[in-house]
Design a protein with these regions (language model features):
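Hydrophobic transmembrane alpha-helices that form the core helical bundles
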Residues: 54, 75-82, 86, 90-169, ...
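Membrane-interface loop-to-helix entry segments
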Residues: 162-219, 274-281, 410-419, 431-445, ...
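TM-loop-TM module centered on a large, flexible mid-protein loop between adjacent transmembrane helices
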Residues: 95-98, 102, 276-345, 364-410
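Transmembrane helix-loop boundary segments of multi-pass membrane transporters
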Residues: 52-66, 149-157, 181-190, 331-336, ...
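Membrane-interface "cap" regions at the ends of multi-pass membrane proteins
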Residues: 1-60, 73-78, 222-225, 229, ...
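A generic transmembrane alpha-helix motif of multi-pass inner-membrane proteins
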Residues: 51-52, 64, 201-203, 207-208, ...
């Protein structure tokens, strides 16, 4: 009751402070749409590809690490579910932080998250060509089709990778500009296809348990690797917990997509359950994917190949190799590729909503709050395309290996979620909500740890193995923070000269 009264007070009066009295966005996002949006955000399919398994250590158990990462994500899911049901507004956690904690902090952190996300989307788009090359190369070798192998080798070159990435993202942006609902439909189609391909791949691996080791050994050799023998313990708590941050940073905590579009979600049931359903489905997919690899190959063989052939031997390559028909090979290969573009499709929507929310609060130019009759924030999408194109150009300029350092900016993502936890703590103290307080304390504590790990573990790119901060990553992270602060201060003083106080805006919940 207290929060309803609190929100009622905030919503009274000064609606003129915002760009307009209604967002103009349309409530057209179904339960299925928002669940698929969240699953794309959590990227279960890529957790089964090469984002995690190459970092396995002797004694690591990915099943236990996945379970722990899932359990530790539950408090964060509670915090997000609490706020999405109480304050269902475009921009999600940005709105919560800026209203419950501090407007300036909320705006600055949202800007840093969006810039970090742009770099991540550009890297995902650029390196999607590696997934395509791997699929074409493997299917080509399985069927003696050297044309496919040659095409794959061409696509992996910098300029073709840039063209492919930019063209794919431009198509996704174009669909979203044409009609907002089409953007969500694209998410749902890619999501359902990706999930179906993953389930089929699980079935194929289970159907080949009897000769899995022999067949995948042949695959490793054919793909240029050397089959490794395992020497190490069958289990180590230290090695298992070492894998926890990889799952925590690349998969489970990314649950802000649904909340970011919460003003467009139809029905209270979808608002209340979308985060939990997405989290549970992601957990099941990741656990099943790792589980069938252990089941079919055994712990020793699978761990040895993850350590020594991690970019050849994984869930997807094994499933393609074991498929007994080209149709299945292509289905699974396209499923992997779909996961890559699934991320880009969700990113196009989520980025636009954060920028829209910032513009609605007058932090960014009002043009970014313009919505077409079809419900599309057109200019935020155009900004997204241009900015992603810029980062793609940076990747080509730096070289793909140097550009990998941009992944180190994930420290900004973990820092952002830490601030969400702090906002939850502050609000729970004011409203005397014990359950929210406990969940927020656990969330803040967890992301304090993850922020430290992302800044100190060389595997995450911010810190190098010699103990020196990567200069590319440091420049990007510091530059992002400085730029975000500068944008907020410029907006604050610009609006103040025009008689609008941003502090007053942040005392109100924005209209739907």
């Amino acid at each position: 009751m207290e929060i309803e009264i609190y929100l009622g007070i905030l919503l009274e009066g000064k609606a003129h402070l915002f760009i307009r009295e209604s967002s103009g966005l349309i409530k057209q996002v179904s339960f299925l749409d928002v669940v698929m949006l969240n699953i794309g955000n959590m990227s279960a399919g890529l957790a089964l590809f090469t984002s995690i398994t190459p970092y396995v250590l002797p004694g690591s158990n990915l099943l236990i690490a996945t379970l722990i990462a899932f359990l530790l994500a539950l408090p964060q899911a509670y915090v997000y579910t609490y706020f999405i049901t109480k304050i269902p507004r475009t921009g999600g956690d940005y709105v919560w932080i800026s209203r419950m904690l501090n407007g300036g902090i909320g705006a600055i952190m949202a800007l840093t998250l969006m810039i970090e996300s742009l770099a991540y989307f550009a890297l995902t788009a650029f390196f999607a060509s590696q997934a395509i090359q791997l699929v074409l190369s493997e299917i080509g070798k399985l069927n003696g089709n050297y044309a496919l192998i040659n095409i794959g080798n061409v696509l992996i070159q910098p300029i073709p990778s840039f063209i492919l990435a930019f063209a794919a993202f431009a198509i996704i942006i174009g669909i979203n500009i044409a009609k907002a609902k089409w953007g969500y439909s694209l998410i749902t189609i890619l999501g359902l296809f990706s999930l179906a391909a993953t389930i089929i791949a699980i079935g194929i691996i289970l159907a080949n348990v009897s000769d899995f080791v022999a067949k995948t050994s042949a695959m490793i050799t054919a793909m240029g690797g050397k089959v490794a023998n395992y020497q190490g313990p069958t289990f180590s708590w230290g090695a298992t917990l070492f894998m926890l941050p990889f799952l925590a940073m690349f998969t489970f905590p990314w649950m802000q997509a649904g909340p970011a579009v919460s003003a467009e979600i139809k029905g209270k049931r979808a608002l209340r359950y979308n985060v939990y359903v997405s989290l549970i489905l992601t957990f099941i997919l990741v656990l099943a994917g790792y589980g069938v690899m252990y089941c079919a190959g055994g712990y020793n063989f699978t761990t040895a190949q993850y350590i020594n052939n991690g970019y050849i031997y994984n869930f997807w390559t094994a499933a393609i190799w074991l498929s007994n028909s080209q149709l299945l090979q292509w289905l699974i290969g396209l499923g992997l590729i779909a996961w890559e573009f699934f991320i880009l499709a969700y990113g196009a929507i989520v980025f636009s909503r954060y920028i829209f929310a910032l513009a609605f609060d007058r932090v960014l130019p009002s043009i970014f709050a313009h919505v077409t009759r079809k419900g599309s924030p057109i200019y935020t999408h155009i900004l997204d395309l241009l900015a992603t194109g810029f980062f793609l150009g940076v990747i080509v300029f730096l070289g793909s290996q140097n550009a990998l350092a941009l992944y180190g900016a994930i420290v900004l993502g973990t820092l952002y979620f830490l601030v969400v936890g702090i906002a939850g703590i502050w609000h729970s103290i004011k409203t005397r909500d014990i359950r929210l307080l406990l969940a927020s304390l656990m969330t803040a504590g967890y992301f304090t740890y993850l922020t430290y790990i992302s800044a100190t573990n060389p595997d995450f790119g911010f810190m190098q193995s010699d103990g020196i901060v990567n200069p590319i990553t440091l420049t990007f992270v510091v530059g992002t923070l400085v730029f975000s602060v500068a944008v907020y201060l410029a907006a604050y003083f610009y609006n103040k000269r025009r008689g609008v106080d941003l502090n007053l805006i942040y005392k109100e919940i924005p209209p739907e």
